[in-house]
Amino acid sequence: MASGLRAAGRATAFVFDLMPMLPSAPLERLSPAPVRERVVLPSDSGEGLGDVFRPARGGGRPGVALSLGVVPAGLEHPQIPRLGRALARAGFVALVYWSPAMQDRRLDPDDVDDLAAAFEHLRGLPGVDPARCGLFGTCVGGAFALLAAAHPSIRDRVAFVGTFAPYASVETFVQAIASRTRRSVAGHTPWTVDPLTWAVYVRTMTDVLPPDERDRLRAGFETPTSSASSAAGLGAESLAVRRLLEPVPLEQTDEAVAGLPDEVRRRFSLMSPLDHLDGIRAPLVVVGHDRDDLVIPVEESRRLRARLLGRPGFRYTEFGLFEHADPTKRRLAPHRLGLELGKFVRYAYPLFRV
């Protein structure tokens, strides 16, 4: 367990290295460049890919398996190697798990098994302390990090799990998308569904349908405002899915979800962290979300908070700094930027105590 002062220093250095608006050149001059290597990971579908970022020297390092969700810009989005290098320079061995399904803009419950296998691969890497390994995920990858942390094969060996901008329940997320409504205890507000959210939604909802009907629905509902394709000739299961691709009044979403095919609803549960939180054994669970996130509404993380509040080791933070985990898209006044960055250091700090 790292001392509090040392952990605070590492967390601060990590934030300076991660955030593009902050000067990181001094850190780069004072420490050798991290090492990056591509690895092949075990997968239910055969072989998966991962990227390992490690400090240039030293052993006995904590490890973190990263699930970064759907990245439209692909594997070389500039923030991804920046994150890996920042973690490595701060002392972690970081393994980025690349999900073939998420690269195809789909959610697949098999990713939970594959992420758990990636975690075990991380624990066996040279220079890694297997007792100080955890998981971290962003966006839908954050939800899968929570699901993997509850996986029976690894849950007793996960030292921490952290997330940023996850969803809590596929069902509530589907209801929000279908109704174009953000729902919270304070009331309901209209929501303009982000194009990325919509693309993943349509591809995930149609994934188990017959290929010809799947392709028809994907083509007919390419954007949230697409003109609906004809329902003629669709089977009962495809019609049930199609109903939720059209705008549905919020009060009708429960009925519409209940009418989905059994296999679709089974997959919903397998991919919903709220259904698996009791399986998490990690002593540290960290959740963060931007209040104005347009891709996954903050209400999803608030549902996690409601279930986890009071649990020892649980930390929750809301930010006004990011645009869906991306710190480059907002311009804040200097004093507000300073406050938000300080908040982010405090959010990250517990992870550096491991």
Q: PLM features: what roles do these ranges have?
A:
Residues 280, 286-289, 293:
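Short beta-strand/loop motif that positions the catalytic acidic residue
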Residues 9-59:
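N-terminal cap/lid segment of alpha/beta-hydrolase-fold proteins
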Residues 75-83, 96-134, 144, 149-152:
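Catalytic nucleophile-loop/oxyanion-hole region of alpha/beta-hydrolase
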Residues 147-237:
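Alpha/beta-hydrolase-fold enzymes
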Residues 175, 233-269, 302-306, 310-354:
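C-terminal catalytic histidine-bearing segment of alpha/beta-hydrolase fold enzymes
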Residues 56-87, 98-99:
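Short, surface-exposed "cap/lid" segments of acyl-processing enzymes
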Residues 133-142, 290:
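Conserved alpha/beta-hydrolase "nucleophile elbow" surrounding the catalytic nucleophile
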Residues 269-284:
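Conserved serine/cysteine hydrolase catalytic core
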